[in-house]
Every structure is written in C-alpha cells, then in structure tokens.
C-alpha cells in the first residue's frame, strides 16, 4: 500500500464518525482532500461543512456541498483534519499547508477532533517537522528573535501569505518534550497569531492508515 493509499484509507474511515443531518468541520491538506472526496459520496446525508481554508472550501463547493461561515454555526459534532506529526498523546504539529489558525479555531468549536494520517506521521517526540507559526507581518523579525531565545531556528516561508493575510515562520531544530508548555509560550509572544502545536486541543480519535489497514487510536 502506497503512502497515498494509506491516507485515502484513513480518510474514508472517518466517514463512520459523520452524523446524519450535521455540519462537518473540514481541515486542509492532502489527506483531507481524500476526506472531502469521501464526504461527497454521502453529501445528501449532511447539511454541509465548515472549512479551514479557501482551498478546501473550493473543493467542497465543487461537489455541491454547502459551506457555512463558522459564525453561523453554534456547534460542530466533529472536525476532521490531518497532521504533519502526531505523538502518543495525540498532540500534533500542524500547519504545513499554512491554514493552522483557522484549523485551530474550528477544532476548538468541535466536540470531537478526528485526526486522519498515514503511519509516517507517528513520532515519539514532536519537532522533526518544522513548527509553523502564523505571524502578523510587521512583527516577523521580532517574533523570529524571540523564537531563537526558545531554542528554535526560525525560517521565513518565502512567498506564502495565509488566508488571513499573515506570514509563516517555520521553526527548525526543536525537540518538543513539553508541547503544552511550548504552545503557551509561543502564543504569548506579541505578534504571534497562533502556532502549529495542537497540544491544548489534542485529537480525540486518530485514524492511522497502515499497510495492514486503518488503526484507531484514542
């Protein structure tokens, strides 16, 4: 089974968590693309979706799935999204696709966070994947200096502007032993919109695509 086939298997497995007549929170990325394709097969059973990126919104709408503004929705039963890394505590690094802020907002609203990944994303300690930070443009250099003080090596993601009009710093060389603590420390830096550590809001269910099939971790 290829990596893409493992992603697809995990994505389709998430359908069993979708409740009839509900609005589904939808993330961003290559694995979520498969989930949107899967969701299209049951689109008549759901009200619609809330999306974390313009890219996902366009794909949902291409299938005729209604996309709601989160401000119009008081509750979401599930949010389905991928991860760049995930540890045994279901803490994640996300934001490789630069949609981390909207992802974090929707995941905060959702009752359950369903994380869909292939088995290459499972790690013991977070940090091999550079940690994305969304930053107000004028604060980029200041935030970078503060991140160096925390032991990281921030790199400006050239040419990338988020859907919110901000920039991304990718922080290399972090071995994140205390994700909850670091998430709070980084978010306390003035000029940071949010960071790609999802520790405070960890995944509730992880569906892992493996060569042997989909494994469910809780």
UniProtKB/Swiss-Prot annotation:
Keywords: Isomerase. Substrate binds at residues 28-31, 81-84, 94-97, 121. GO terms for molecular function: ribose-5-phosphate isomerase activity. The keyword Isomerase applies. Its EC number is 5.3.1.6. Pathway: Carbohydrate degradation; pentose phosphate pathway; D-ribose 5-phosphate from D-ribulose 5-phosphate (non-oxidative stage): step 1/1. The keyword Isomerase applies. It is an enzyme of class 5 (isomerase). One of its GO terms (biological process) is pentose-phosphate shunt, non-oxidative branch. Belongs to the ribose 5-phosphate isomerase family. This is Ribose-5-phosphate isomerase A. The lineage of its organism: Bacteria, Pseudomonadati, Pseudomonadota, Gammaproteobacteria, Alteromonadales. The gene is rpiA.
